[in-house]
Amino acid sequence: MILSCQSISKSFGTDEILKDVSFHIEANEKAAIVGINGAGKSTLLKIIMGEETSDAGEVILAKDKTIGYLAQYQDVSGHRTIYDEVLYARTDILEMEQKLRDMESEMNSRTGEELEKLMDIYHRQSHEFELQGGYAYRSEVTGILKGLGFSDEDLSKQMSELSGGQKTRVSLGKLLVTKPDVLLLDEPTNHLDMESIRWLENFLRAYKGTVVIVAHDRYFLDRVVTKVVEIFQHKAYVYQGNYSDFAKKKAKVREDLLKQYYNQQREIRHQEEVITKLKSFNREKSIKRAESREKMLDKIERIEKPVEDNTDIKIVL
């Protein structure tokens, strides 16, 4: 288990959003959080990230694991180019690269034992740089930006020139190059064309980490996720499989619950009719029997009638 939500509750004033929400996500798992608009999906992601506080419960992230978050609306500013904005998301790699360049220059002025010591340090740091993906990093940045729909000409554009949608794509690119252990993505396909969506699907499926997605695109979720967490009437319900698997299981659960509801309603009406009849006899014994049945009815845990499935998912063609 890499991420666990335990008994999360959240209200805004008198408006209850989440109630006793519990689920866990395994390492390398790809999961979706679904529900109607206003169900609390984005709020839940913010609670996981620590951008919102819950009224109760806790979020547990496995020790030494990193987490990254793409919100629906991003406002990336500054005077860098698109390419540099994403490139500088990994300053650790750039700093390692600069140290290697500095050592290469310093080697020209070193001889003998000093040179050997410097070369030993260089080889060790060069190996670490390779393990961190440093030698492929610049081409990786270019590949991710192109995958997200930016052309070669776009890469030299200033961030200040970009639209809100383009800035969100840049933010997504920055997140992808940092490779956190857990990716939280809130509507990652909103500003992508079909080609870029397909690229992102492939990227996330191959991603060596955990991915948690809020999205409205059913086909996208079908191709990426293997678990669905539904936020329904303030609580969380977990289904294994992709979105289509979830939809089938949810329909069956609703059908079974509807049968239970109608069966219970029939029994309640029957008991109410018996109570009315017993009271009509107007005898002490009959009234006591009626009162006994009323107490029994009061103790019954009423099944709520399941509402229509209005999960806010659309088909993107």
Predicted segments with their positions:
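ABC ATP-binding cassette signature C-motif
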Residues: M1-Y262, I315-L317
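Intracellular alpha-helical coupling/juxtamembrane segments of multi-pass membrane proteins
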Residues: K250-V274, S286, A290-V307
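A structural signal for long alpha-helical coiled-coils and helix-turn connectors
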Residues: E104-N108, A247, T276-K279, D298-E301
